């Protein structure tokens, strides 16, 4: 069996030569510029969390804690964002369970369209959110607020318009 896997891997590497070539990471917006040193510099960091809107917060907590055995936090109401959140520790990242807090919550609107809940957004850390905002605006990426707001982790966050991000709502959080 091990020999079969080695042969398959070797064949795949031959078919896909890029698999053997290290991929250079795009680290800064300036690295994309044709003029070295031009433009603001900011670094994209790790995936902080994946947020999932849930119609029943306690049921979702129980699933991740009792069925999957994950480390699950307590619900935290965030009235300024119109949500209650629960973080599920997944080792190298987190899942954020979102539940509406009030009828005008953006999550209430999401759950009206998606009765069973579902993936709401991804959150990626950046090393300088203010410079990232300036650079993204210059690149015509729409930001859903005029300025960064304090998010669930007590750090500045912004959201990027899904239409500019391949249909995904992207949250950037100051690392």
From Swiss-Prot:
Mitochondrion in keyword set: yes
Span of the transit peptide along the chain: 1-35
Positions of modified residues (N6-acetyllysine): 149
Modified sites of kind N6-succinyllysine: 113, 149
Enzyme Commission code: 5.1.99.1
Record's subcellular location: Mitochondrion
Ranges of residues in domain VOC: 46-175
Residues given in the record as Co(2+) binding sites: 49, 121, 171
Biological role stated in the UniProt entry: Methylmalonyl-CoA epimerase involved in propionyl-CoA metabolism.
Family that this chain belongs to: Belongs to the methylmalonyl-CoA epimerase family.
Name of the protein: Methylmalonyl-CoA epimerase, mitochondrial
Native source organism of the sequence: Bos taurus (Bovine)
Source species taxonomy: Eukaryota, Metazoa, Chordata, Craniata, Vertebrata
